[in-house]
Amino acid sequence: AYLIAQNGDPRKEEIAFAQTYFAVQTRKQELIEARLEQIERLEARNRLTASEKELSGVIFERLRDHESFARIRSKGDAALFGGRTTLDMKKHLGVPEARPLADFLPTITIKAKDLANEMTAHNVKTRDLRTEPTITSEHVGSNRVVREALAKRGIRPEQLPPAEDVRKLERRLDSDTRKLPKQVPRLGEEKGENGGGDPP
Protein backbone atom coordinates (compact mmCIF):
# COMPACT_ATOMS: atom_id res chain seq x y z
CA ALA A 1 0.00 0.00 0.00
CA TYR A 2 2.84 2.39 0.87
CA LEU A 3 4.61 1.88 -2.47
CA ILE A 4 1.37 2.23 -4.39
CA ALA A 5 0.60 5.47 -2.57
CA GLN A 6 4.09 6.89 -3.02
CA ASN A 7 4.21 6.08 -6.73
CA GLY A 8 0.58 6.94 -7.45
CA ASP A 9 -0.96 10.04 -8.95
CA PRO A 10 -1.56 12.59 -6.14
CA ARG A 11 -4.40 14.15 -8.18
CA LYS A 12 -6.49 11.08 -7.36
CA GLU A 13 -8.27 11.56 -4.06
CA GLU A 14 -7.46 8.09 -2.71
CA ILE A 15 -3.75 8.40 -3.55
CA ALA A 16 -3.53 11.91 -2.06
CA PHE A 17 -5.22 10.64 1.11
CA ALA A 18 -2.85 7.65 1.35
CA GLN A 19 0.20 9.88 0.81
CA THR A 20 -0.98 12.23 3.55
CA TYR A 21 -1.72 9.30 5.85
CA PHE A 22 1.77 7.82 5.43
CA ALA A 23 3.41 11.24 5.85
CA VAL A 24 1.54 11.75 9.14
CA GLN A 25 2.43 8.25 10.36
CA THR A 26 6.10 8.80 9.50
CA ARG A 27 6.12 12.09 11.44
CA LYS A 28 4.43 10.43 14.43
CA GLN A 29 7.11 7.73 14.43
CA GLU A 30 9.87 10.36 14.27
CA LEU A 31 8.35 12.20 17.26
CA ILE A 32 8.03 8.97 19.26
CA GLU A 33 11.65 8.03 18.54
CA ALA A 34 12.87 11.51 19.51
CA ARG A 35 10.93 11.36 22.79
CA LEU A 36 12.34 7.91 23.59
CA GLU A 37 15.87 9.22 22.98
CA GLN A 38 15.20 12.17 25.30
CA ILE A 39 13.85 9.87 28.01
CA GLU A 40 16.89 7.60 27.59
CA ARG A 41 19.21 10.59 28.08
CA LEU A 42 17.35 11.71 31.19
CA GLU A 43 17.46 8.19 32.65
CA ALA A 44 21.19 7.94 31.86
CA ARG A 45 21.77 11.26 33.63
CA ASN A 46 19.88 10.02 36.70
CA ARG A 47 21.97 6.82 36.74
CA LEU A 48 25.15 8.93 36.50
CA THR A 49 23.97 11.01 39.46
CA ALA A 50 23.47 7.79 41.44
CA SER A 51 26.89 6.37 40.50
CA GLU A 52 28.57 9.70 41.37
CA LYS A 53 26.86 9.64 44.78
CA GLU A 54 27.98 6.08 45.35
CA LEU A 55 31.57 6.81 44.29
CA SER A 56 31.63 10.01 46.34
CA GLY A 57 30.43 8.06 49.37
CA VAL A 58 33.04 5.34 48.88
CA ILE A 59 35.78 7.96 48.53
CA PHE A 60 34.63 9.95 51.56
CA GLU A 61 34.39 6.79 53.66
CA ARG A 62 38.03 6.02 52.88
CA LEU A 63 39.60 9.49 52.77
CA ARG A 64 37.34 11.60 55.04
CA ASP A 65 37.90 14.57 52.73
CA HIS A 66 35.02 16.40 51.02
CA GLU A 67 37.18 17.87 48.22
CA SER A 68 38.89 14.63 47.17
CA PHE A 69 35.95 13.48 45.02
CA ALA A 70 36.09 16.63 42.86
CA ARG A 71 39.84 16.26 42.35
CA ILE A 72 39.56 12.57 41.50
CA ARG A 73 36.60 13.13 39.16
CA SER A 74 38.43 15.91 37.31
CA LYS A 75 41.45 13.67 36.73
CA GLY A 76 39.11 10.92 35.54
CA ASP A 77 37.48 13.40 33.16
CA ALA A 78 40.91 14.34 31.82
CA ALA A 79 41.50 10.66 31.00
CA LEU A 80 38.08 10.34 29.34
CA PHE A 81 38.25 13.63 27.43
CA GLY A 82 41.75 13.30 25.98
CA GLY A 83 43.54 15.49 28.54
CA ARG A 84 40.76 18.02 29.17
CA THR A 85 39.72 18.42 32.80
CA THR A 86 36.15 19.03 33.94
CA LEU A 87 36.73 22.80 33.86
CA ASP A 88 38.36 22.58 30.40
CA MET A 89 35.35 20.68 29.06
CA LYS A 90 32.92 23.16 30.60
CA LYS A 91 34.70 25.98 28.79
CA HIS A 92 34.90 23.94 25.56
CA LEU A 93 31.16 23.18 25.60
CA GLY A 94 30.04 26.56 26.98
CA VAL A 95 28.65 25.09 30.21
CA PRO A 96 27.97 27.65 32.97
CA GLU A 97 30.59 27.30 35.71
CA ALA A 98 28.02 26.60 38.45
CA ARG A 99 26.32 23.80 36.48
CA PRO A 100 27.41 20.15 36.26
CA LEU A 101 29.21 19.22 33.04
CA ALA A 102 27.11 16.07 32.71
CA ASP A 103 23.92 18.15 32.29
CA PHE A 104 25.20 19.15 28.84
CA LEU A 105 26.80 15.90 27.68
CA PRO A 106 25.29 13.62 25.04
CA THR A 107 23.85 10.29 26.16
CA ILE A 108 26.85 8.20 25.11
CA THR A 109 29.25 10.33 27.16
CA ILE A 110 26.94 10.26 30.18
CA LYS A 111 26.86 6.46 29.96
CA ALA A 112 30.65 6.35 29.56
CA LYS A 113 31.15 8.39 32.74
CA ASP A 114 28.64 6.19 34.57
CA LEU A 115 30.47 3.01 33.54
CA ALA A 116 33.83 4.45 34.64
CA ASN A 117 32.31 5.43 38.02
CA GLU A 118 30.84 1.95 38.52
CA MET A 119 34.17 0.31 37.65
CA THR A 120 36.07 2.60 40.00
CA ALA A 121 33.66 2.12 42.92
CA HIS A 122 33.76 -1.65 42.44
CA ASN A 123 37.55 -1.82 42.35
CA VAL A 124 38.04 0.63 45.24
CA LYS A 125 35.89 -1.66 47.38
CA THR A 126 37.21 -5.03 46.20
CA ARG A 127 40.86 -3.93 46.26
CA ASP A 128 40.36 -1.98 49.50
CA LEU A 129 42.03 1.17 48.15
CA ARG A 130 42.46 3.79 50.89
CA THR A 131 44.65 6.62 49.60
CA GLU A 132 43.86 9.44 47.21
CA PRO A 133 46.69 8.54 44.81
CA THR A 134 45.57 4.90 44.52
CA ILE A 135 41.89 5.82 44.10
CA THR A 136 42.81 8.52 41.57
CA SER A 137 44.92 6.04 39.64
CA GLU A 138 42.03 3.57 39.63
CA HIS A 139 39.55 6.19 38.39
CA VAL A 140 41.93 7.45 35.71
CA GLY A 141 42.46 3.85 34.59
CA SER A 142 38.71 3.19 34.43
CA ASN A 143 38.16 6.32 32.34
CA ARG A 144 41.09 5.50 30.09
CA VAL A 145 39.70 2.01 29.37
CA VAL A 146 36.27 3.48 28.57
CA ARG A 147 37.88 6.09 26.30
CA GLU A 148 39.83 3.38 24.46
CA ALA A 149 36.62 1.41 23.87
CA LEU A 150 34.92 4.51 22.46
CA ALA A 151 37.96 5.37 20.33
CA LYS A 152 37.93 1.88 18.78
CA ARG A 153 34.45 2.72 17.51
CA GLY A 154 35.56 6.14 16.22
CA ILE A 155 34.10 8.16 19.10
CA ARG A 156 36.11 10.93 20.76
CA PRO A 157 34.08 12.27 23.72
CA GLU A 158 35.75 15.70 23.66
CA GLN A 159 34.76 16.14 20.00
CA LEU A 160 31.05 15.48 20.51
CA PRO A 161 28.83 18.57 20.50
CA PRO A 162 27.03 19.62 23.67
CA ALA A 163 23.52 18.31 24.17
CA GLU A 164 20.49 20.24 25.36
CA ASP A 165 20.58 21.26 29.02
CA VAL A 166 19.11 18.28 30.87
CA ARG A 167 17.07 20.60 33.14
CA LYS A 168 15.33 22.16 30.13
CA LEU A 169 14.80 18.70 28.67
CA GLU A 170 13.25 17.46 31.91
CA ARG A 171 10.91 20.48 32.15
CA ARG A 172 9.81 20.02 28.54
CA LEU A 173 9.18 16.30 28.99
CA ASP A 174 7.19 16.98 32.19
CA SER A 175 5.16 19.67 30.41
CA ASP A 176 4.49 17.39 27.43
CA THR A 177 3.44 14.57 29.76
CA ARG A 178 0.96 16.84 31.56
CA LYS A 179 -0.57 17.76 28.20
CA LEU A 180 -1.25 14.13 27.32
CA PRO A 181 -4.80 12.92 27.88
CA LYS A 182 -5.28 11.24 31.25
CA GLN A 183 -6.80 8.18 29.63
CA VAL A 184 -6.41 7.29 26.00
CA PRO A 185 -9.55 5.57 24.70
CA ARG A 186 -9.09 2.12 23.27
CA LEU A 187 -9.88 1.42 19.64
CA GLY A 188 -13.66 1.39 19.11
CA GLU A 189 -14.33 3.28 22.35
CA GLU A 190 -15.50 6.66 21.26
CA LYS A 191 -17.95 8.87 23.08
CA GLY A 192 -21.39 7.46 22.71
CA GLU A 193 -20.20 3.86 22.51
CA ASN A 194 -20.12 1.61 25.56
CA GLY A 195 -21.90 4.12 27.80
CA GLY A 196 -20.15 7.36 26.88
CA GLY A 197 -16.61 6.12 26.47
CA ASP A 198 -16.31 4.29 29.79
CA PRO A 199 -14.68 0.88 29.68
CA PRO A 200 -17.18 -1.99 29.24
Task: Label each region the model flagged.
Residues 1-200:
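Positively charged, phosphate-engaging catalytic surfaces used for nucleic-acid and nucleotide handling
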